[in-house]
């Protein structure tokens, strides 16, 4: 098929990874995929690696910036819009698909001005600033979590595109004649509160329910985190990164982690129960809303960072580790919330809009 699609996503993996999954699906259907990003985001590494054409515009976020930056903002946004319009004219896409990040504001407006159908995908339970603005004139809005957007005539609940290898056929049976396996995820940059909390909490558990521990600490945090475990007499494998997440999820019986949108979707895909500690200063407290999606159905417990010390974490760990059937039930519930067709569904929506 001789047709171009322009994907907009930038900044963090939370925006870029779902967009990459959809880019591969577009390519499988014969579309040529172009990508609109910014010079400083993770897309600069990942998009060329995927063999996609990357176009860059100069735009940054405005939250938390000083007065001088805010005074310069209108000029920056105007320049970014002009750059985005040039890309849209050059690519001539049948549709423009935004997955979030600063790039989507100017890019989405450029699509609107050019009369090109715009579709946006929101990964979080609370829409980001750019997507909230674009939703008013987008042709369609895809949401990972139900009722993120108010306009039911435009929205489609698709789930988050995640790696297909994470979808286990059936959830594992936890504690099947062995020690429980606890996976701690701090994210690529690490979550120092989790790195401090878990060693102390695990040291308070009775020896007979001590789990095997695999702790992803984040870059430059592995040595000190491993030392914390040694100091309290808890055996743990500590790594700065986990290269094979599918293998790690397949190993685990229980996960302690933040509540980023992709993490929530991956936990559901893998059918894993979790103890979620939302990032307390996330924009619009979106991680708490993400966590509620699993917690209200019984697939997770939410443990606010401000009220969760070592004693509280130890008590919750003891509760779930001593009840294998509860872990199994949480795992089944998590798996029931997965959206295995999310990638295809998002691309189907785009194709319908582009050619409908």
From Swiss-Prot:
Q: InterPro entries per the record?
A: GlcNAc_MurG, Glyco_trans_28_C, GlycoTrans_28_N
- Entries under Gene3D superfamilies matching the protein: Glycogen Phosphorylase B
Q: Which residues bind UDP-N-acetyl-alpha-D-glucosamine?
A: 12-14, 124, 163, 188, 242, 287
Q: Which keywords label this protein?
A: Cell cycle, Cell division, Cell inner membrane, Cell membrane, Cell shape, Cell wall biogenesis/degradation, Glycosyltransferase, Membrane, Peptidoglycan synthesis, Transferase
In Swiss-Prot or TrEMBL terms, this protein is called UDP-N-acetylglucosamine--N-acetylmuramyl-(pentapeptide) pyrophosphoryl-undecaprenol N-acetylglucosamine transferase
NCBIfam families named among the record's database cross-references: murG
Query: Which function does this protein serve?
Result: Cell wall formation. Catalyzes the transfer of a GlcNAc subunit on undecaprenyl-pyrophosphoryl-MurNAc-pentapeptide (lipid intermediate I) to form undecaprenyl-pyrophosphoryl-MurNAc-(pentapeptide)GlcNAc (lipid intermediate II).
One Pfam family, short name: Glyco_transf_28
Q: Which organism is it from?
A: Pseudomonas syringae pv. syringae (strain B728a)
Q: Which GO terms describe its cellular component?
A: plasma membrane
Q: What is the lineage of its organism?
A: Bacteria, Pseudomonadati, Pseudomonadota, Gammaproteobacteria, Pseudomonadales
Q: Write down the EC number.
A: 2.4.1.227
Question: What does the record give as the reaction this protein catalyses?
Answer: di-trans,octa-cis-undecaprenyl diphospho-N-acetyl-alpha-D-muramoyl-L-alanyl-D-glutamyl-meso-2,6-diaminopimeloyl-D-alanyl-D-alanine + UDP-N-acetyl-alpha-D-glucosamine = di-trans,octa-cis-undecaprenyl diphospho-[N-acetyl-alpha-D-glucosaminyl-(1->4)]-N-acetyl-alpha-D-muramoyl-L-alanyl-D-glutamyl-meso-2,6-diaminopimeloyl-D-alanyl-D-alanine + UDP + H(+)
């Amino acid at each position: 098929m001789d047709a171009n699609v322009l994907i907009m996503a930038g900044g963090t993996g939370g925006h870029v990874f779902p967009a990459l999954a959809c880019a591969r699906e577009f390519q499988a259907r014969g579309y040529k995929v172009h990508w609109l990003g910014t010079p400083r985001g993770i897309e600069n590494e990942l998009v060329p690696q995927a063999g996609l054409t990357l176009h860059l515009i100069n735009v940054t976020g405005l939250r938390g910036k000083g007065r001088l930056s805010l005074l310069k903002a209108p000029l920056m946004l105007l320049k970014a819009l002009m750059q985005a319009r040039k890309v849209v004219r050059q690519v001539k896409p049948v549709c423009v698909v935004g997955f979030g990040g600063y790039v989507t504001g100017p890019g989405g407006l450029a699509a609107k001005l050019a009369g090109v159908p715009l579709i946006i995908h929101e990964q979080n339970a609370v829409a980001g600033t750019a997507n909230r603005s674009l939703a008013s004139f987008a042709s369609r809005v895809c949401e990972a979590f139900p009722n993120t957007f108010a306009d039911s005539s435009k929205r489609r609940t698709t789930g988050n595109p995640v790696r297909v290898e994470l979808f286990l056929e059936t959830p594992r049976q936890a504690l099947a004649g062995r020690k429980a396996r606890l996976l701690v995820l701090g994210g690529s940059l690490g979550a120092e509160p989790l790195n401090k909390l878990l060693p102390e909490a695990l040291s308070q558990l009775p020896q007979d329910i001590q789990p095997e521990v695999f702790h992803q600490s984040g870059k430059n945090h592995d040595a000190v985190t491993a030392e914390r475990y040694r100091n309290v007499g808890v055996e743990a494998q500590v790594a700065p990164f986990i290269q094979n997440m599918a293998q790690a999820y397949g190993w685990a019986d229980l996960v302690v982690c933040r509540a980023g949108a992709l993490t929530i979707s991956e936990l559901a895909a893998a059918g894993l129960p979790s103890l979620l500690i939302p990032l307390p200063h996330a924009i619009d407290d979106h991680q708490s809303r993400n966590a509620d999606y699993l917690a209200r159905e019984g697939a997770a417990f939410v443990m606010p960072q401000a009220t969760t010390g070592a004693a509280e974490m130890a008590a919750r760990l003891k509760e779930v580790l001593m009840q294998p059937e509860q872990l199994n039930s949480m795992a089944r519930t998590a798996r029931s919330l997965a959206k295995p067709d999310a990638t295809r569904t998002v691309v189907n929506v785009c194709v319908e809009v582009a050619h409908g």
